[in-house]
């Protein structure tokens, strides 16, 4: 589930044209002509090496296999790591990755027996065994290891034990029945125990002990040193400090520019025919380009092989060029991602409680000009949504209706909640703790080619009813650091999921707020938590769907998010790979399967 600039000569002249527009028309024509000449004379890339270049709008915070968890990290991890189970991009279903087959579920529906593929080897030549898998699972719950999201996801695991008769087998036992227990295995990235924990310190503790946060009180110097080493920033960025089972390894990370992966020599899976094990390119470069103008120029120069992150205007502009169409497949593919505005329902001390009142949150949803946003920002290439489960997902409720834009109702709700303009400055205000407070909140967002325009459109809409928005643009990692720390008034974010049944615990359970998880806004109470727990323990799909529908209705009624739209992916894929098969599931393509020998 889940899960999401630079200047150059071209951009410089575009900005200069805007300035010169206010002076003389000949000057404008001169600059435009020079810009056109610059574009028409771009030097194309030479395809003399077996390299695939993939575009990213931002770089990940890190590539730590446990502690980092964002869309860009997972995209690169597809090439460098192996999970016990992984998502089949074509079918949207789980399939074995490091396991030889799907886990065997025992009759009690609580025990899952797993057997690893034989013959998998680490970079030092050592064979992968169940000891590595058990260490990998323990690391996800160990106090002091910085994987807060994983701790809530693995809260249902009671034990993990090796098979004394088979060095490749182990059994997970769950505390209680859970609708998607097997899906937990898709979160387990295999770690080499000898590399990460050479003294086998976690081997001294069973799973139950490690799942207890108080165990840290008994940790000695050795354990503290292990935690510091495990969490060290070098383990997320420095090539020789990283280890993985995938067909590629980190060669170079040029911060803010590119991440270069190199194909491993004599990799254990070279003979595999599975799509996730293909390693056709010698190198895969993940190149960071944050703005559309430089990206457009890079595509004209054929410096990018694949991007799923074109804006709608950029795609339409490129598709109007015959040279681009001759070199690239391009189009739109659906996704399981949505954009939202989250409102802080539990602000920290000292922060104005703008959104603790449900009427205010509903007013915010009624003000949001969703149809205009879709028309202007996405050029009609997105879909309005009513909640966090999207069409095509298992528990989608087709009867849940989207809220309609209604400024008059919004104004009435704001007035009823005490927000009125008492001083005639066109901004509503309210007496809070004896002080007049203007409705002037900060909206944090991740800087990207489209969010600036989107935020300005939103800002104008809310100002029309007496609410001031103060935009706060942040880089990718800073944005999510702020979100996890709950240090925001409102945030413009996005979640990505899959066809797999949704576990609402990660985003909507109150524990995921208190323990630093992904419930950024502080949604939830005892009743909604109980519904989430009931849905997660219900093995009957029809009964579970009813519970999930009720959870969706509560979320819509409480309005912690203003749901904006289900995004589509605007992509370009170089034709030298011979086909344009893209999948709805992220990252939409198996990078190692791209065959650069096809001309």
Give the residues covered by each predicted segment.
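Bacterial N-terminal signal peptides
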Residues: 24-36
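Long beta-strand-rich cores associated with HINT superfamily self-processing modules
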Residues: 571-599
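N-terminal secretory signal peptides that target proteins for export/translocation
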Residues: 1-20
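Surface-exposed binding/hinge segments that line
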Residues: 152-225
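Extracytoplasmic/periplasmic ligand-capture domains
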Residues: 41-46, 90, 117-148, 159-163, ...
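Bacterial Sec-dependent signal peptides at the C-terminal "C-region" and cleavage site
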Residues: 34-50
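N-terminal lobe/hinge region of extracytoplasmic solute-binding protein
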Residues: 55-107, 138, 243
């Amino acid at each position: 589930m889940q899960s999401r600039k630079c200047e150059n000569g071209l951009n410089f002249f575009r900005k200069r044209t805007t300035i010169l527009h206010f002076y003389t028309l000949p000057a404008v024509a001169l600059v435009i002509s020079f810009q056109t000449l610059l574009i028409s004379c771009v030097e194309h890339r030479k395809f003399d090496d077996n390299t695939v270049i993939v575009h990213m709008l931002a770089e990940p915070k890190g590539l730590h296999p446990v502690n980092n968890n964002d869309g860009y990290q997972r995209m690169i991890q597809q090439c460098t790591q192996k999970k016990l189970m992984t998502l089949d991009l074509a079918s949207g279903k789980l399939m074995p990755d490091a396991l030889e087959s799907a886990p065997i579920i025992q009759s009690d529906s609580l025990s899952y027996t797993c057997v690893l593929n034989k013959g998998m080897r680490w970079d030092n030549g050592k064979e992968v065994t169940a000891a590595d898998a058990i260490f990998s699972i323990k690391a996800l719950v160990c106090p002091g290891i910085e994987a807060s999201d994983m701790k809530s996801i693995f809260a249902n695991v009671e034990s993990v034990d090796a098979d004394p008769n088979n060095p490749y087998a182990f059994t997970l036992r769950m505390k209680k029945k859970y609708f998607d227990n097997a899906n937990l295995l898709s979160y387990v990235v295999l770690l080499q125990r000898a590399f990460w924990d050479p003294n086998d310190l976690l081997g001294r503790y069973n799973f139950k002990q490690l799942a207890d946060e108080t165990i840290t009180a008994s940790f000695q110097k050795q354990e503290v040193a292990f935690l510091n080493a495990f969490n060290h920033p070098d383990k997320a960025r420095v090539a020789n400090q990283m280890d993985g089972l995938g067909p590629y390894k980190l060669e170079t990370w040029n911060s803010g520019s590119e991440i270069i992966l190199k194909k491993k020599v004599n990799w254990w899976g070279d003979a595999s025919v599975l799509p996730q094990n293909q390693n056709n390119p010698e190198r895969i470069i993940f190149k960071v380009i944050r703005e559309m103008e430089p990206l457009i120029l890079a595509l004209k120069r054929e410096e990018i092989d694949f991007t799923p992150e074109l804006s709608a205007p950029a795609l339409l502009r490129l598709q109007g060029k015959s040279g681009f169409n001759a070199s690239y497949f391009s189009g739109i593919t659906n996704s399981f991602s949505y954009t939202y505005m989250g409102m802080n329902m539990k602000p920290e001390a000292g922060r104005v409680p703008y959104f603790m009142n449900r009427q205010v949150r509903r007013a915010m949803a009624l003000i949001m000009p969703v149809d205009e946003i879709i028309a202007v920002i996405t050029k009609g290439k997105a879909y309005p949504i009513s909640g966090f489960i999207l069409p095509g997902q298992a528990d989608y409720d087709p009867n849940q209706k989207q809220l309609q834009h209604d400024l008059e109702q919004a104004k009435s709700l704001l007035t009823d909640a005490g927000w009125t303009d008492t001083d005639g400055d066109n901004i509503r205000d309210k007496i809070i703790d004896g002080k007049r407070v203007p409705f002037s909140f900060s909206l944090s967002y991740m800087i990207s080619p489209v969010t600036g325009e989107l935020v300005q459109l939103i800002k104008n809409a809310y100002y029309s009813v007496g609410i001031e928005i103060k935009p706060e643009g942040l880089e990718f990692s800073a944005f999510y650091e702020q979100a996890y720390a709950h240090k925001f008034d409102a945030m413009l974010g996005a979640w990505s999921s899959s066809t797999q049944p949704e576990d609402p615990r990660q985003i909507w359970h109150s524990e995921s707020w208190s323990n630093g998880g992904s419930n950024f806004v502080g949604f939830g109470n005892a009743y909604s938590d109980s519904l989430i727990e009931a849905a997660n323990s219900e093995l009957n799909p029809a009964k579970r769907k009813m519970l999930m529908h009720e959870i969706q209705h509560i979320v819509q009624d409480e309005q912690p998010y203003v749901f904006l739209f289900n995004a589509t992916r605007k992509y370009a894929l170089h034709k030298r790979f011979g086909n344009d098969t893209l999948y709805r599931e992220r990252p939409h393509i198996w990078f190692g399967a791209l065959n650069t020998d096809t001309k």
